[in-house]
Every structure is written in structure tokens, then in C-alpha cells.
Amino acid sequence: MIKCTRRINFDAGHRIIGHKNKCQFLHGHHYVLEITIAANKTDTLGMVIDFGLIKNLAKKWIDANFDHNLILHQDDKEMGQQIENYTRQKIYYMRNNPTAENIATHLKNEIFPKLFVSQNFFVTSLKLYETQNCFVEV
């Protein structure tokens, strides 16, 4: 198996409903997302996937939905709507708390399978860095 990884950076805010410490408050991170795609063999050009294709598909989705936006739990809709009305900022709602674990799982299981439709390669893992020192891998 051959693997290729592409890194994408984005900035987003979130909060964790029910957290007992400072993560219960709105705050932001400079996220780094590493997308690893694998194939059993390369294509006729000798590639698993063109790195530009990963960038075009994944970064386009990230920029449209996460970058410089708020990622909130759907139970935070009332607050999100007030923020959106005041700032015109886009809010991305998730079915669960927007922890690094849940964001990475959401991307890997729900978003990227729709973006990377191919029988020749597949997303094997995602690493999502919330800080330089803290990341999750799914």
C-alpha cells in the first residue's frame, strides 16, 4: 500500500457544551489537518493521487465551511443564529460537540467520502492538530 499525505491549515472558532473548564467558552484555534490517502498501486502516471486534487477538493470544502467560521453543536443554534445575524459570519453546525475528535471523525466518515469518490484510492487517516502539541488521529 502506498500513502500520500497533504496538509491543510485553517482557522476556526468553537466551544464545547458541558465542558467544565475554559473550553466551554467561544475560542479559536489554528488547525492543521493532515489527510492521508492510500492505494494498492499507483496510476499510469505513477501517483496515488495528485496532491493538487487533494488540495482542490479538501481545501475548497474546508475554506467554504470551516475557515474563519464557527463550528458549533447543533444545540447551540440559538447562540449561533445571534452571532450570524450580528456578524454575518457563517456557522457550521455538527450533531455533536465540535471537539477535535468529532471534527476529524466527521470529516473522515461523512465529508471526505463524498469528495474523494474513487475505486483506486481511499482516505486512510486524518490527523487534526488543534495546537502544535495536541492532535487527534482517526
Curated annotation (Swiss-Prot):
Pfam annotation, one family: PTPS
Gene3D superfamilies for the chain: 6-pyruvoyl tetrahydropterin synthase/QueD (3.30.479.10)
Residues of the active site: C23 (proton acceptor), H68 (charge relay system), E130 (charge relay system)
GO biological process: queuosine biosynthetic process
Organism superkingdom: Bacteria
Uppermost EC category: lyase
Family the UniProt entry places it in: Belongs to the PTPS family. QueD subfamily.
PANTHER family: 6-PYRUVOYL TETRAHYDROBIOPTERIN SYNTHASE, PYRUVOYL TETRAHYDROBIOPTERIN SYNTHASE
Protein name: 6-carboxy-5,6,7,8-tetrahydropterin synthase
Higher taxonomy: Bacteria, Pseudomonadati, Pseudomonadota, Alphaproteobacteria, Rickettsiales
Gene: queD
